[in-house]
UniProtKB/Swiss-Prot annotation:
The active site is at S48, H275. This is Lipase 2. GO terms for cellular component: extracellular region. Pfam families: Lipase_GDSL_2. GO terms for molecular function: carboxylesterase activity; triacylglycerol lipase activity. It comes from the Bacteria. Residues 1-31 form the signal peptide. Disulfide bonds join C65-C89, C138-C152, C205-C254. Optimum temperature is 45-55 degrees Celsius. The activity drops quickly at temperatures below 30 degrees Celsius. The keyword Disulfide bond applies.
């Protein structure tokens, strides 16, 4: 190609590249700025199942609450990028939403406000010590009976269920109404409790969970009633109920480490027995995010 022609091609190429660069720069300068996704203002309420009591590491902010920084609220916040205020506290009852549970521990509802976007909670299991008493009574009866019969059911009958219906259920509803009043714009998720016992007795589990064979389904039915009370209270107050009855089946305290979400009463790997382990807290977070459509 003659030199004058070559120079013309090079000149045209440089001009074209320059025009393209100017065009991109101009387009970039006039493009609408990307809209950042708003950060969720997330408040976690609840008892030891929410706090992850027994799961390491422990939050040093308040050792009385035995709150883990690997609990399901932290997993949700880490996954979604939410701004977390975690006021969960081991042994909390619904009454602790409006009263100081310990000196220096404010009522849990004080953490809520009109700017709160998301609230999660697991609560009700400690109210009137009903469910704790059921586990303790049935465990003691199981040891004394050598695992035979249904001594706990025979002695207590419907008393635990009656207590849940008469006291726990209305207290749950009142607590959720309190959440709604303090955080009127928030999405509220009330979590059920993952299964502690299998559906039927497993003789190989007796040393870990010393329940008489006939009391295993009895205690599971009491837990099902507690979860149903949470469900009804949630539905009647506009909250979302997160049901664990299906996804936690086969992950109870009788299962092997790595499969179970709940640690057994005896010979477990957690500081707090009959509570979720680290795997359980992660699975609770994952299922809650699935139900709420969070990612």
């Amino acid at each position: 190609m003659p030199k004058p022609a070559l120079r013309r091609v090079m000149t045209a190429t440089v001009a074209a590249v320059g025009t393209l660069a100017l065009g991109l720069t101009d387009a970039t300068a006039h493009a609408a700025p990307a809209q950042a996704t708003p950060t969720l203002d997330y408040v976690a309420l609840g008892d030891s199942y929410s706090a992850g009591s027994g799961v390491l590491p422990v939050d040093p902010a308040n050792l009385l609450c035995l709150r883990s920084t690997a609990n399901y609220p932290h997993v949700i916040a880490d996954t979604t990028g939410a701004r977390l205020t975690d006021v969960t506290c081991g042994a909390a009852q619904t009454a602790d939403f409006t009263r100081a549970q310990y000196p220096g521990v404010a009522p849990q509802l004080d953490a809520l406000g009109t700017g709160t976007d998301l609230v999660t909670l697991t609560i009700g299991g400690n109210d009137n010590s009903t469910f704790i008493n059921a586990i303790t009574a049935c465990g003691t009866a199981g040891v004394l009976s050598g695992g035979k019969g249904s001594p706990c059911k025979d002695r207590h009958g419907t008393s635990f269920d009656d207590e849940i219906e008469a006291n726990t259920y209305p207290a749950l509803k009142e607590a959720l109404l309190g959440v709604r009043a303090r955080a009127p714009h928030a999405r509220v998720a009330a979590l059920g409790y993952p299964w502690i016992t299998p559906a039927t007795a497993d003789p190989s589990c007796f040393l870990k969970l010393p329940l008489a064979a006939g009391d295993v389904p009895y205690l599971r039915a009491i837990q099902a009633h507690l979860n149903d009370a949470v469900r009804r209270a949630a539905e009647e107050t506009g909250a979302t109920y997160v049901d664990f009855s299906g996804v936690s089946d086969g992950h109870d305290a009788c299962e092997a480490p790595g499969t179970r979400w709940i640690e057994p009463l005896l010979f477990g790997h957690s500081l707090v027995p009959v509570h979720p382990n680290a795997l359980g807290e992660r699975r609770m977070a994952e299922h809650t995010m699935d139900v709420l459509g969070l990612d």
